[in-house]
């Protein structure tokens, strides 16, 4: 796994919103696309934060009006990111260490270019053929 890079397994079909997007609209984006997170970006596509299904637990618990509340109120801003050139082993280790399921893939010039998830990693591992046991 050490020689396999994030670019090989990441999803480039990304879903983004802006910090002023309403929570209701972000939730609709996630539901319509069957995804567990949206990345929050500025006008130049640089990452500002991430909003995940876990954040909606807090939104529901606080009973905030979802049609009036921007995602900036609930998004995580201290986001651990990776690059397309990073080893998937390093990314997997970081995801386990921090207990999260989504890692945005960023490029210094282009901003957000993809997402790698625990599902992406599991999908890759399930397609890798293991060597046969020595006889």
Sequence positions of predicted segments:
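A glycine-centered beta-loop-beta connector
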Residues: 30-33, 38-54, 95, 103-119
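Tandem CBS (Bateman) regulatory domains
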Residues: 1-12, 52-81, 87-98, 112-135
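The conserved cystathionine-beta-synthase
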Residues: 17-34, 41, 82-99, 106, ...
């Amino acid at each position: 796994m050490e020689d396999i890079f994030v670019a090989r397994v990441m999803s480039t079909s990304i879903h983004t919103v802006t910090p002023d997007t309403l929570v209701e609209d972000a939730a609709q984006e996630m539901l319509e696309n069957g995804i567990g997170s949206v990345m929050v970006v500025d006008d130049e596509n640089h990452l500002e934060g991430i909003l995940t299904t876990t954040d909606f637990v807090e939104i529901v618990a606080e009973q905030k009006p979802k049609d009036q509340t921007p995602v900036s109120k609930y998004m995580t801003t201290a986001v651990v990111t990776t690059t397309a050139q990073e080893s998937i082993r390093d990314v997997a280790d970081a995801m386990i260490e921090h207990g999260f399921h989504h890692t945005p893939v960023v490029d210094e010039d282009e901003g957000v270019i993809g997402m790698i998830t625990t599902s992406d990693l599991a999908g890759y591992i399930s397609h890798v053929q293991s060597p046969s046991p020595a006889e």
